[in-house]
């Protein structure tokens, strides 16, 4: 449309204010049709029955992310395990057996109880498998051979985190260990890599209250009015992996934790060696050659 014709069209007077309102209403933007507030007749005939059925059903069980669904006691729907949101439909009496006591009660506010506590896994055992991976037993090795083999096993792990952790630990402590400590460290390396990493790096659970936020003035002026939730700083915490009873009083685990503390930023000043303390675990050290 040309510019003079467009100006002439906009300058044309309307017939009446009512005509202007109806024109705007007819040309309003949007794809939704105008509906009256009274929608009682639009619901299906089965809506009341379905609503009553849903409200009378028991709440679905809460399954924490630390509860394995590959075990045989988890409810099945046909050949496969049911999704977590449909557990109550398959087995309304199912109680998840979480390895961490009190976690289910904490997340459900005491509404749901934990199932039967499972025994701690032994060496070579994993959730969901029916066999046991037995570690290799070596006999007749001298101290020099044991040190060389443990150095190799400390550097060639399954994940990068345990590679850095155990290789730096072996570089500092392996040459100072006696035969009994070497044998204990040999058994310790048979554990799963993620278990070793978390046992050495995690902080033990405390009895303190869960950290809570203090609402700031900015949030009171903006977030509180808009319905936004307050930030939950400190509410997230990684699942604690308890140390099994076989390593509760281990000297090797104590030295490994001390090694982590000495190489951390907070443990730099308390480190025994100022040359290596506080340097972190960012690099695998060079291969060490043992004389004996």
Curated annotation (Swiss-Prot):
Misc remark: This protein may be expected to contain an N-terminal transit peptide but none has been predicted.
Primary residence: mitochondrion
Annotated function: Plays an essential role in the assembly of succinate dehydrogenase (SDH), an enzyme complex (also referred to as respiratory complex II) that is a component of both the tricarboxylic acid (TCA) cycle and the mitochondrial electron transport chain, and which couples the oxidation of succinate to fumarate with the reduction of ubiquinone (coenzyme Q) to ubiquinol. Required for flavinylation (covalent attachment of FAD) of the flavoprotein subunit of the SDH catalytic dimer.
Subunit structure: Interacts with the flavoprotein subunit within the SDH catalytic dimer.
Cross-referenced InterPro entries: SDH (IPR005631), SDH_sf (IPR036714), SDHAF2 (IPR028882)
Domain of life per record: Eukaryota
Alphabetized UniProt keyword annotations: Chaperone, Mitochondrion
Coiled coil stretches, renumbered: none
One GO CC term on file: mitochondrial matrix
Protein location: Mitochondrion matrix
Pfam families linked: Sdh5
Biased composition (Polar residues): 55-68
Family from the record: Belongs to the SDHAF2 family.
Protein name stated in the entry: Succinate dehydrogenase assembly factor 2, mitochondrial
Gene Ontology biological process terms from the UniProt entry: mitochondrial electron transport, succinate to ubiquinone; mitochondrial respiratory chain complex II assembly; protein-FAD linkage; tricarboxylic acid cycle
Chain residue ranges for the region called Disordered: 27-68, 266-292
